[in-house]
């Protein structure tokens, strides 16, 4: 999902004092256009129990000066639950890959969090950076049908106004069946009777119909 390129408007007015008189100038209006834009995309848009989600964060610099000393922070889908804050995703260690203009770079400093933090990022002038990493759903990931996880990445540092981007993944919908077969008694006497038991479990979020 794309982050928004923001534009800030500022005004300025001069005042001239001479003797007992005061003269105000017109109001000059200017615009500041952010040169960084961020997008965040999940490679797979659905998730399941104990599933891995691969995220791709892209940062583009439309300016003519490199942006250095940036930090990329991911809230890992944190959401309010009563008075608590639950985090449904856990960063998978050693999965960060950092590319500058498509070329793989040395892995930057990573703090697993939450929030996940990747620091020491530099975006070349007129260039782009891509950061790829994996997160795993944990016990706080909602699994009911139509549940979703929305997480936000924030790019900050280097004297810039923080830039954010969001991505939403949806819980996989459908039955998830397992079957276990057992036999009793064990051991059985010759010409004895065996009883087979089948246990079918559905750990999915919808019923399994015939």
Positions of the model-derived regions?
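Exported/extracytosolic protein signature
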Residues: 2-210
């Amino acid at each position: 999902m794309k982050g928004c390129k923001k534009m800030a408007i500022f005004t300025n007015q001069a005042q001239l004092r001479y003797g007992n008189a005061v003269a105000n100038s017109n109001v000059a209006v200017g615009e500041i256009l952010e040169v960084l834009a961020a997008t965040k995309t999940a490679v797979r848009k659905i998730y399941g129990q104990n599933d891995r989600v691969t995220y791709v964060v892209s940062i583009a610099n439309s300016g003519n000066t490199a942006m250095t000393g940036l930090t990329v922070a991911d809230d890992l889908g944190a959401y309010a639950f009563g008075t608590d804050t639950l985090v449904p995703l856990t960063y998978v260690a050693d999965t960060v890959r950092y590319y500058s203009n498509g070329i793989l770079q040395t892995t930057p400093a990573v703090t697993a969090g939450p929030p996940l933090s990747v620091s020491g990022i530099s975006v070349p002038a007129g260039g782009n950076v891509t950061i790829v990493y994996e997160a795993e759903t944990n016990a706080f990931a909602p699994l009911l049908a139509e549940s979703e996880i929305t997480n936000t990445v924030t790019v900050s540092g280097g004297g810039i106004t923080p830039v954010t981007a969001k991505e939403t993944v949806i819980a996989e919908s459908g039955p998830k069946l397992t079957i276990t077969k057992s036999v009793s008694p064990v051991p059985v006497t010759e010409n004895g009777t065996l009883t087979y038991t089948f246990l079918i479990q559905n750990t999915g979020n919808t019923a399994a119909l015939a």
